[in-house]
Swiss-Prot record:
Gene name as annotated: petA
Gene Ontology cellular component list: chloroplast thylakoid membrane
Gene3D superfamilies named among the record's database cross-references: 2.40.50.100, Cytochrome f large domain, Single helix bin
Assembly with partners or alone: The 4 large subunits of the cytochrome b6-f complex are cytochrome b6, subunit IV (17 kDa polypeptide, petD), cytochrome f and the Rieske protein, while the 4 small subunits are PetG, PetL, PetM and PetN. The complex functions as a dimer.
Protein name: Cytochrome f
Superkingdom of this protein's organism: Eukaryota
Keyword Signal: yes
Job of this protein: Component of the cytochrome b6-f complex, which mediates electron transfer between photosystem II (PSII) and photosystem I (PSI), cyclic electron flow around PSI, and state transitions.
Annotated organism of origin: Cycas taitungensis (Prince sago)
Membrane topology designation: Single-pass membrane protein
Length: 320
């Protein structure tokens, strides 16, 4: 009877332990997958450097195109679309953190003029909501509503990201004026090559740390390689570690030089940045323009009528 109780207790303990481990794994996995935009947020106060370079390029080394479309002008206190296009080949697979291949993800940072911000849900029309889908936008900082980040999200579904933006009203915000403003955007597809601490990810090329002969290549149980190089100058052995993901380009017995690539470059993604301009239009100016156009049209009509009247008078005089 005592043995049965002990067995039941052990069974319950193992079940609870497995459940706890699964929960920890899920929480950790979720936090890591959602951490990519936070890399820049944690390391930089402002995502755009004084030179105009967006800091995402420090981790995403390859260059790829990105486009942004915004209206030429908007009225105060109105919601408009800022459409960011991140072209990517849906057939290409990227190297994941575990070394396996997976679909490309995308992300973007949108730097708006002072006063512009993400539109509140109750101001977004059903048409724009349908274009947004299930995307979740966040501020770069709690006090920086004009800088928005998104991602990583599946590139297959969101190669075009629609940001719903609310324009400011100079009548209530004295810091804003009716002017032409710049908008900056950065967009990436795929994982980065360098982490914020300067260490390499497994999504980049690995080079030899010394010159010598490759004496041993050990394939690790969980993937990746340990490459032993006999230094050509002093004979000491140097071990270079290659994580799972990149493919080896060298073999045992081969003589290699320092900085020679040991692997291919598995990166298929890249980062790009662009800009656009938008005019915050004064409604009174628009009304004035409409009145001017109306007056010009009326003047043209009166001129045509006057001309016809004059022609009739001339025709009557000729007949007389």
């Amino acid at each position: 009877m005592r043995n049965i109780n002990t067995y039941d207790w052990m069974k319950k303990w193992m079940t609870r332990s497995i459940s706890i481990l699964v929960m920890i794994h899920m929480i950790t996995r979720t936090s890591i997958s959602n951490a990519y935009p936070i890399f820049a947020q944690q390391g930089y106060e402002n995502p755009r450097e004084a030179t105009g370079r967006i800091v995402c390029a420090n981790c995403h080394l390859a260059k790829k195109p990105v486009n942004i479309e915004v209206p030429q002008s908007v009225l105060p206190d109105t919601v408009f679309e800022a459409v960011v296009q991140i072209p990517c080949d849906m057939q290409i697979k990227q190297v994941l953190a575990n070394g396996k291949k997976g679909a490309l993800n995308v992300g973007a940072v949108l730097i708006l003029p002072e006063g512009f911000e993400l539109a509140p849900p109750d101001r977004i029309s059903p048409e724009i909501k349908e274009k947004i889908g299930n995307l979740y936008f966040q501020n770069y900082r709690p006090n920086q509503k004009e800088i928005l980040v998104i991602g990583p999200v599946p590139g297959q579904k969101y190669s075009e990201i629609v940001f719903p933006i609310l324009s400011p009203n100079p009548a209530t915000n004295k810091e804003v004026h009716f002017l032409k403003y710049p908008i900056y955007v950065g967009g990436n597809r795929g994982r980065g090559q360098i982490y914020p601490d300067g260490s390499k990810s497994n999504n980049t090329v690995y080079n030899a740390s010394t010159t010598g002969r490759v004496s041993k290549i050990l394939r690790k149980e969980k993937g990746g390689y340990e490459i032993t190089i006999d230094n050509a100058s002093d004979g000491r052995q140097v071990v270079d570690i290659v994580p799972p993901g990149p493919e080896l380009l060298i073999s045992e017995g081969e003589f290699i030089k320092v900085d020679q690539p040991l692997t291919n470059n598995p990166n298929v993604g890249g980062f790009g940045q662009g800009d656009a301009e938008i005019v915050l239009q004064d409604p009174l100016r628009v009304q004035g323009l409409l009145l001017l156009l109306a007056s010009v049209i009326l003047a043209q009509i009166f001129l045509v009528l006057k001309k016809k009247q004059f022609e009739k008078v001339q025709l009557a005089e000729m007949n007389f």
